[in-house]
Regions:
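Mid-domain catalytic core of redox enzymes
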Residues: 33-161
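Helical element adjacent to the flavin cofactor pocket in flavoenzyme catalytic cores
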Residues: 1-49, 56
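Conserved FAD/dinucleotide-binding core of flavoprotein oxidoreductases
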Residues: 65-70, 100-102, 122-123, 162-199
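A conserved FAD-binding loop/helix module that cradles the flavin
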Residues: 267-288
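A glycine-rich dinucleotide-binding beta-alpha-beta segment and adjacent secondary-structure elements
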Residues: 142-153, 206-270
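Active-site-proximal substrate-binding core of FAD-dependent oxidoreductases
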Residues: 37-38, 289-305
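Generic, well-ordered alpha-helical scaffold segments in large soluble proteins
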Residues: 14, 18-22, 31, 61, ...
Length: 305
């Protein structure tokens, strides 16, 4: 993996600086209430504080369900398109732990100073164990013996924490969007966190005594705090029927929507999720082509998977 110096927030700061350098404006804490549409064309948005922002185009990087089912009047959309968007699969399957540590963990399987501490570590013993963890998700539970993908980025970038302290990031599978069909509770969240911490303790005795703080994000937090429907970090399941020309839905796979000048550029579009920026970059290429002002610094969207 590549590491951003200063943490993943540095990526956001760099993108913000680039936009501002080009004359753009960033407004944080400004949720959108609805997309304004007149005569089949998008011409702006209404923010949740009532402000209107108008423009020649509206470009949404929200997931396809949130964009069209929550913020666009259904009457403005073709019925078949609405049906396909409603059928788009977007079940979340993962959770996240961000852990502040008083000191680096000591894994019994790794010698002191092992270079593997600087890499990506997986907590799993076999394919069968991963399958059992997935079975829990299918039954509507978080995994009792999860598959954890763990990194300690401060091993590479110590500027992220005070001297001697560390930060651990745990990507955890599996966690369903609902627990046996009901919403997550705080007790569920805390139980999920304990399960993850207990598992790490088995591989690194004494680990839990070094924990200073834990931020837990189940699919509930990912939806409520980050805006990811059902907590799906890829804005839609990456199944064969939802890839390539079928992403997000057949007939609208080139970042355009049925509403003129309403574009989609998030991970619900091709090629899907991950920290790569390809959906946004491809959407930008298509928008420039639509404007008949292609950038000499950007190849056609189809050239980028």
């Amino acid at each position: 993996w590549g590491f951003a110096r200063g943490g993943m927030g540095s990526i956001t700061k760099a993108l913000t600086a680039s936009l501002q350098a080009a004359g753009g404006t960033v407004r944080t804490g400004s949720g959108i209430e609805k997309v304004l549409v007149r005569n089949g064309r998008a011409y702006g948005v209404v923010l949740d504080n009532g402000d209107e922002v108008q423009g020649r185009r509206v470009i949404s990087n929200m997931d396809v369900k949130r964009t069209f089912l929550k913020h666009v009047d259904e009457a403005e959309l073709p019925g078949e398109f609405v049906r396909r968007v409603k059928a788009f699969k977007i079940r979340g399957s993962s959770g996240k732990l961000n852990i502040a540590l008083d000191c680096a963990p000591k894994f019994t399987a790794l010698p002191e100073g092992s270079p593997h501490m600087k890499g990506d570590m997986h907590f799993t013993d076999s394919i069968e164990k991963m399958e059992r963890a997935y079975d829990d998700w299918k039954a509507g539970h978080y995994s009792v013996d999860p598959f954890q993908d763990m990194m300690i980025p401060t091993m590479i970038d110590p500027t992220m924490t005070p001297p001697g302290k560390h930060f651990m990031s745990c990507f955890v599978q599996y966690a369903p969007p609902k627990i046996e069909g009901r919403d997550w509770t705080d007790a569920d969240r805390d139980g999920f966190a304990r399960t993850c911490l207990d598992q790490i303790e088995k591989y690194a005795p004494g680990f839990k005594s070094s924990v200073l703080h834990v931020e837990v994000r189940t699919p509930r937090e990912l939806e409520n705090e980050v805006g990811l429907t059902e907590g799906n970090i890829f804005q839609g399941e990456l199944t064969f029927d939802q890839l390539l020309f079928n992403r997000p839905v057949p007939g609208c796979a080139q970042y355009r929507s049925p509403i003129k000048d309403l574009w989609i550029c998030g991970s619900s579009t091709h090629p899907g999720g991950g920290v790569m920026g390809a959906p946004g970059r491809n959407a930008a290429s298509e928008i420039l082509r639509d404007m008949k002002t292609p950038s000499k610094d950007m190849s056609d969207a189809y050239a980028v998977l």
